[in-house]
Amino acid sequence: GPGTKTPPGQLLVLGDEYMQKKAVSLQKVLLVRSVLTMAIADALTAVLDSKYTYFVRRPFMMDPSLITIMPTPNHPSYPAGHSTLSTAGATVLKYYFPEDKDMWEAKAYEAGMSRIWGGIHYMMDHEAGVIMGGKVGQA
């Protein structure tokens, strides 16, 4: 939820802070928040279904000598959840605030890549998550 370190929490906080800074009308805030929350929920459903369909092991599972720099989730690697959820959220936010599309894309990219840099995902996980998240966000 809002205020947590998870992708849904971060997306909601980023969206709220942005809309407050831009003095967006209450009507638009409610609309954007509703669509953003639905996109996050749909992306989570899609990514978890795919993770357990493909059941790709995480890098540290394949190479026990690999030391990760962040906590490692206990679910399959592919596709990357952070990439999927962040891209879905960024796609929604780009739709409503196209003037800052580059910023939303950069935030989603960084969220997804952080999991590769942390040693818990492969690049293919991120790439698939970006594709999936983009499609969910457009739906």
Language model regions located:
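Hydrophobic alpha-helical bundle signature of multipass membrane enzymes
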Residues: 1-139
